A protein has these predicted regions:
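Flexible mid-to-C-terminal extensions adjoining Fe-S/redox cofactors in radical SAM and related proteins
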Residues: 192-265
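Radical SAM/AdoMet-radical enzyme domain recognition
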Residues: 1-115
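A C-terminal junction/extension of Radical SAM enzymes
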Residues: 92, 114-194, 226-228, 233, ...
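Short clusters of hydrophobic/aromatic residues that line enzyme substrate/ligand-binding pockets
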Residues: 26, 53-56, 128, 151, ...
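Structured loop/turn residues at beta-strand edges in well-structured enzyme cores
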Residues: 36-37, 104, 172, 229, ...
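A structural signal for well-ordered alpha-helical scaffolds and beta->alpha junctions
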Residues: 3, 49, 65, 93, ...
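Glycine-rich, flexible loop/turn motifs
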Residues: 52, 110, 124, 166, ...
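Alpha-helix boundary recognition
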Residues: 11, 35, 70-73, 101, ...
Length: 265
């Protein structure tokens, strides 16, 4: 309800601002403010038909979104597209890539492979098989040769580590934090609402005080590979970075030192 006031404040602050949105509430006034403030947008596009996109985003979302995306493109507003790949839209990925990067002129296309986490544990019928995951990765490598840094496979299994250090260090608590609607501070979004990983509250404490708390140490190298119950015995632990993410297993109901459920190694 306060988006107009937020946009006004963002323009005044002269900060680099990126808003993640479904774009459905963008109107002419808000688009003008976004353009004036050089605000960047991150928008989800999960299919090239209403059948595939609306399956994830709700009935009627696709037609509204396409209309708004065309306006943003004409207004030369900077935006990126995020697509979550699942069984229903897998056959449209080539089309989504072409439409996003060529026709719309999106700065970047982020591809995420749907993982069996959260609500997806009850919707495993649309989660990609191991073979389909491999096919997506091959498609990504092929398209990356054409689009370079404009296309990014953003999920964790695409990442590799060349570190030989046994310390477990995550971006959470080092280069990012998550703040909920009550100004509670967490290491990342997977810790939100988990009291064990609440690092402080911005109403009661200064961010600098919260940031310097010893609570962060388990994300800053105090944990080592030997402390991990599953990953320490994996032959790929030297190159895999999924071991560094400790809150995804917690989010899944596992322990802090467990591996994530979709690791097949």
């Amino acid at each position: 309800p306060d988006i107009d006031n937020f946009l006004f404040k963002a323009i005044q602050c002269h900060f680099e601002t990126i808003i993640l949105t479904n774009a459905l509430l963008l109107n002419k006034q808000r688009i003008d403010m976004i353009k004036k403030g050089h605000i960047q947008l991150g928008i989800s596009l999960d299919g090239m038909t209403s059948d595939t996109h609306d399956f994830i985003r709700g009935k009627g979302a696709f037609d509204k979104l396409i209309r708004i995306l065309k306006i943003l493109s004409l207004e030369d507003i900077k935006f990126s597209i995020t697509c979550t790949i699942n069984k229903k839209n897998l056959c449209q990925i080539d089309e989504i890539i072409d439409y996003s990067l060529n026709e719309l002129g999106a700065q970047t296309l982020f591809l995420n492979r749907l993982r069996p986490m959260g609500r997806m544990n009850q919707n495993t019928n649309i989660v990609l098989s191991e073979q389909e995951n491999d096919n997506v990765y091959k498609l990504y490598l092929n398209q990356k040769g054409k689009y370079n840094k404009r296309i990014i496979l953003a999920d964790d299994s695409a990442l590799k580590s060349n570190s030989h250090d046994n310390k477990i260090v995550c971006a959470a608590g080092n280069s990012l934090i998550a703040i909920d609607e009550n100004f509670n501070v967490y290491p990342c979004i997977y810790g939100i609402d988990n009291p064990e990983y609440k690092m402080g509250n911005l109403i009661d404490q200064n961010l600098d005080v919260i940031w310097k708390s010893s609570k962060w140490n388990i994300f800053r190298g105090n944990l080592t590979l030997e402390d991990l119950t599953d990953c320490r015995n994996c032959k790929l632990h030297a190159v895999c970075v999924m071991k560094n993410c400790r809150l995804k297993p917690v989010y899944e109901g596992r322990s802090f030192t467990s591996s994530i459920s979709y690791c097949n190694k």
